[in-house]
């Protein structure tokens, strides 16, 4: 081999080695949470079940502390500057509604519940299932996921209740929708059909959800839907 070829070959070898080392020492950080990872993770599913409650109305705060009864003849709210009086004086309209965006908020909650019900079956618990020392943890997590599904069904029923008491019959949608879903295929269901759906979902939830006095982990389940909530609705 000619002498001048040796430095060239050595240089090429060093380039390959240093390039490979650079990949090992400076790996690309994976910052994207994929849909698949989110669906199989128990902790992410827990977080998503909690997120379903974020569409509930904010108690008495979204109407300046007034109850909805003050929008009718049932009650009178004494704070004269409160937004609730917009109903009484007739100053509210589609762009200025003291009740907020009830249509958007409740349908977002319904769509989130539909997606949760579909994807909560994909949680990967095999690492517990096949570990003889983790059988109790495995069963507890299965039970939790099962309960969260019925919480989601109750919340979906509640969001439909919030819609029908304002708008009457609305489309009953129980499957997840994507960006390419054709919304024109959905029509308005009758009020009686909506009420039957709400009652059926609440009956199913009440048969599974626990009463507050029978909860075993009250601290971590405070504020979640219960048997009493489903029966009350």
Where are the language model's segments positioned?
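Bacterial Sec-dependent N-terminal signal peptides
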Residues: 1-30
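Membrane-proximal, proline-rich intrinsically disordered regions
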Residues: 21-69
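Proline-centered turn/helix-capping motifs that create local helix->coil transitions or kinks
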Residues: 23, 61, 163-172
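Conserved, well-structured interaction surfaces
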Residues: 46, 54, 81-167, 183, ...
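Short, conserved phosphate-binding/catalytic loop or strand-edge motifs used
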Residues: 173-181
